[in-house]
Amino acid sequence: MSNYQLEWVSPKQLRPHEDVILSIVNENIEILRKDNSMAPIIVDKNSMVILDGHHRYYASLSLGLPKIPAIMIDYNSEQVEVREWNRIIAPDSSIRDFLRVFRSSVDGKYCVSYKSDVVFCDDNIYSLYWKEEAIEQLLSRMGYNVVKTADQEATISIPPVPKNVVIDFSYKGLRFPPKSTRHIYHFYIPKQRIILQWD
């Protein structure tokens, strides 16, 4: 028995949980127009929350596509995991002193760490992720290169967003920063592009 089902769904039925980068949405719009095809997005069949494919989703909304291909899975399955994207920051030499400026309460359920040092914590993981995003944006403007990675040896580590929080915040209409969740599927997910239906 398959762990997923491929369906055509209206983008208006779907619930995003992550924000997007406008330039990537625009790139996706151009690709959809040029190729007339897209890789399916991945959606929880029970809640209609988008798990992967937010930029393609927003591109399809912009183009007014009536239906898009979606791989429908059971998010509650133990075969679906949510992991974190850690960060590598370069150059690394002065980053510890810079992060001390942001050091606040180290009390809280969720914490961001620089190597093994806790930088800040919060009881609300949504607030924690947006604080981290603001710091990353500031670092980028200052000339640092911030790369999100699966590497466990990365410079900055952040806890994964629990599945129930992904669903709850999506239903509240709130979005985590781009590339907050890293979903791992312990079963085959097809990635072939599918010809779009425009009517």
Curated annotation (Swiss-Prot):
Q: Which UniProt keywords apply?
A: ATP-binding, DNA damage, Kinase, Nucleotide-binding, Transferase
> Pfam families recorded for this chain?
ParBc
The annotated consequence of gene deletion is:
Cells grow a little slower and form smaller colonies than wild-type, reduced survival after UV treatment. Cells undergo almost no recombination in mating reactions.
Keyword Isomerase included in the entry's annotation: no
Locate the transmembrane regions by residue number.
Answer: none
InterPro entries with a match to the protein in the record: ParB/Sulfiredoxin_dom (IPR003115), ParB/Sulfiredoxin_sf (IPR036086), SerK/SbnI_C (IPR023098)
Gene3D superfamilies tied to this protein: Conserved hypothetical protein from pyrococcus furiosus pfu- 392566-001, domain 2, Conserved hypothetical protein from pyrococcus furiosus pfu- 392566-001, ParB domain
* GO MF term set: ATP binding; kinase activity
UniProt-listed SMART domains: ParB (SM00470)
Summarize the protein's role: Probably part of a 4-gene DNA damage response locus in which the upstream ups system, in combination with this downstream locus, functions in homologous recombination to rescue Sulfolobales from DNA-damaging threats. This protein might function in the DNA transfer machinery.
Tell me the protein family, please. Belongs to the ParB family.
Which protein is depicted? ParB-like protein Saci_1498
Q: Which organism is it from?
A: Sulfolobus acidocaldarius (strain ATCC 33909 / DSM 639 / JCM 8929 / NBRC 15157 / NCIMB 11770)
